[in-house]
Amino acid sequence: MRKTTRLVEIRTARASEQGGRCFYCGFPMWSANGLGARGLQKGKWIPANLQCTAEHLLPRSDGGQDGRENVVAACRFCNQTRHRRGKVLPPNQYREHVQGRVRSGKWHSAAVRRFVE
């Protein structure tokens, strides 16, 4: 099995286990195979930031592997934002940070928040 196919299977399984919601922010996600797209079909525009990605809890750059124990499903925005920081926060610390920002309405854009309401 190709590495990318295996990672897609792991991401899809993890997204299903997470109820189609991002590991960090809890927003619903969509993917090419339609997982999580139910309930996001309010119109033709689906925010790219809510695309489901495979998030490595321990980044590959730090030796993280592609196994189920190291991969969760995260929206594109949370995944990219975590890795754009100077120092990548540990997953639980980053999750707390993100959820605090979500509660204060300062995480996803207003358009994305309106889209999922």
Regions found by a protein language model. Give the residues of each.
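Short, charged surface segments at domain edges that flank catalytic/cofactor-binding sites
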Residues: 1-39, 113
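Generic low-polarity alpha-helical segments
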Residues: 7-10, 14-15, 44, 57, ...
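Histidine-centered nuclease catalytic patch
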Residues: 29-71, 86
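Short amphipathic alpha-helical patches
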Residues: 34-37, 78-85, 98-102
